[in-house]
């Protein structure tokens, strides 16, 4: 992983390039999170990689390192009600836009993980598997995942029967069994449960 995507954007004349990624599109419960991160070009952060390939402990450590070293960052989310109202894709776009809007300093070019460009106030590009190719996107994936995981741990205390601390809302066997036994709670995505609960 290197800064080639960021570097290309700077060569085009852009002055502030950030990476944006999401966490939590697939779970049956809880919000979808996104983060936007503007790193100093060339900054080396050991072990920076796609958040899904890192242990929870490593992600937590990198979360602080990224926030301390970023030129600017922003975190945003869309909750389960918004996901049910506008669908998960649009809710993900909303979370990404909120993350961008929450940055301490504005960027003028965005690198988005995936193959679909959300509506953004500035130009940018999509990068498939960007969280494994761009340090800015990798950093964003970590901020988004850790932020969402922390929220799900709080929900685990509120709704202990679902064991959100174990699966963070994903459709594991334990989670699906709890849904059949107890039914959904207020943070479940109703549109995601139709196939499971009928």
Locate each region found by the language model:
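RNase H-like, Mg2+-dependent phosphodiesterase core
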Residues: 1-198
């Amino acid at each position: 992983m290197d800064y080639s995507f960021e570097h290309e954007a700077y060569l085009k004349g852009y002055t502030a390039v950030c990476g944006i990624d999401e966490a939590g599109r697939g779970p049956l419960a809880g919000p979808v999170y996104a983060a936007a991160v503007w790193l100093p070009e060339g900054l080396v952060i050991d072990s920076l990689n796609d958040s899904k390939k890192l242990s929870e402990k490593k992600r937590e450590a990198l979360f602080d390192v990224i926030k301390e070293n970023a030129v600017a960052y922003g975190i945003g989310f869309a909750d389960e009600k918004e996901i049910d109202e506008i669908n998960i894709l649009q809710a993900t776009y909303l979370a990404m836009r909120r993350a961008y809007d929450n940055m301490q300093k504005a960027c003028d070019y965005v690198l988005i993980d995936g193959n679909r460009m959300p509506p953004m106030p500035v130009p940018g590009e999509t990068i498939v598997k960007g969280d494994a190719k761009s340090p800015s996107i990798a950093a964003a994936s970590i901020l988004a995942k850790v932020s969402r995981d922390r929220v799900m741990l709080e929900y685990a205390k509120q709704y202990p029967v679902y064991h959100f601390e174990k699966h963070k809302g994903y459709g594991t066997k334990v989670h699906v069994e709890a849904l059949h036994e107890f039914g959904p709670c207020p943070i479940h995505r109703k549109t995601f449960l139709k196939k499971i609960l009928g």
